[in-house]
Design a protein with these regions (language model features):
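A domain-start/cap signature at the N-terminus of enzymes
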Residues: 1-38, 76, 198-200, 210
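Gly/Ser-rich "nucleophile elbow"/oxyanion-hole loop immediately N-terminal to the catalytic nucleophile
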Residues: 30-31, 90-133
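Alpha/beta-hydrolase fold active-site loops
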Residues: 37, 76, 126, 151, ...
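Active-site machinery of serine-nucleophile hydrolases
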Residues: 38, 45-106
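The conserved beta1-alpha1 loop
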Residues: 42-44, 157, 182-183
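Primarily recognizes the serine-hydrolase "nucleophile elbow" in alpha/beta-hydrolase
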Residues: 116-119, 124-172
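Short beta-strand/loop motif that positions the catalytic acidic residue
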Residues: 173, 179-182
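C-terminal catalytic histidine-bearing segment of alpha/beta-hydrolase fold enzymes
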Residues: 181, 185-188, 193-199, 203-249
């Protein structure tokens, strides 16, 4: 067991009006603030199911409740929703990269709004949404559909293909702070088809709060798993994100 995981409530469940049921884990900090920010993490394609401890542990999303991260916010609530399948489950296909709607974004938005409603200490002006791969797709989808709801987005190994982001959708993202994290050798969600061109379009549009950390490779910076300079799969750029090793110079 990982002690910090035990600080999460993993019994959360939400059923939307369309019948879709989503599970979730959550963390509410002890803080002196009257209002606390909310950090939302959306898992990747391999962490679906009905056990929210899976997305908590698989990509170390529990780190958002760690003292290292919490100190930046003087306490922040954490919400980790889970889909029974994958966020990119299309309405007419098993997999959408943005060419059609997915079946989950409305239910997920309902879950988030319901959670915020039931936790009145959450600051509506400081709701931060992020995710990796499948969850990166869904992060971008929710930012497009709800541009005035979230304070910022942070996306690792984006799976939403740039070619399917229309000009009108891009305009909705113009004023949203977004940080993309990707690896150039990501063979699953290729940077040149996803984050790189989208970042350039947002900069050209005039979004002055869009940032991009593009790594050559994903290396075991902890030296605990593969050893010094061990190369991870290039898709795993969230390793840097959850180790708090993504900086803007």
């Amino acid at each position: 067991t990982i002690p910090i995981v035990d600080e999460f409530d993993t019994s959360g469940a939400y059923t939307h009006g369309d019948g879709i049921r989503l599970t979730y884990a959550s963390f509410i900090p002890e803080t002196k603030q009257n209002k606390t920010p909310l950090i939302i993490w959306l898992h990747g394609g391999g962490e679906g199911g009905t056990d929210p401890t899976i997305p908590l542990i698989a990509n170390k999303a529990y780190n958002y409740a760690s003292p290292e991260i919490q100190k930046y916010f003087e306490g922040a609530a954490v919400l980790v929703p889970q889909t029974p399948t994958r966020w990119m489950h299309g309405v007419s296909s098993n997999y959408t990269r943005g060419q059609e709607d997915d079946i989950y974004h409305k239910a997920l938005m309902g879950l988030i709004q319901n959670f915020v409603k039931n936790n009145p200490s959450i600051d509506h002006d400081r709701i931060y949404l992020g995710g990796c791969s499948n969850g990166g797709y869904m992060t971008l989808k929710l930012l497009i559909e709800n541009p005035d709801y979230f304070a910022a987005g942070y996306i690792s190994s984006l799976a939403y293909h740039n070619e399917f982001v229309t000009e009108s959708q891009l305009l909705r993202l113009k004023n949203i702070p977004i940080w993309f994290v990707h690896a150039q050798d990501d063979a699953v969600t290729e940077a040149d088809k996803t984050a790189t061109p989208l970042f350039k379009r947002l900069k050209q549009l005039g979004n002055n709060n869009v940032y991009y950390s593009l790594f050559d490779h994903v290396i075991d910076i902890s030296n605990q798993y593969g050893g010094k300079n061990y190369l991870y799969n290039g898709h795993w750029s969230w390793v840097y994100l959850h180790a708090n090793q993504v900086f803007y110079d």
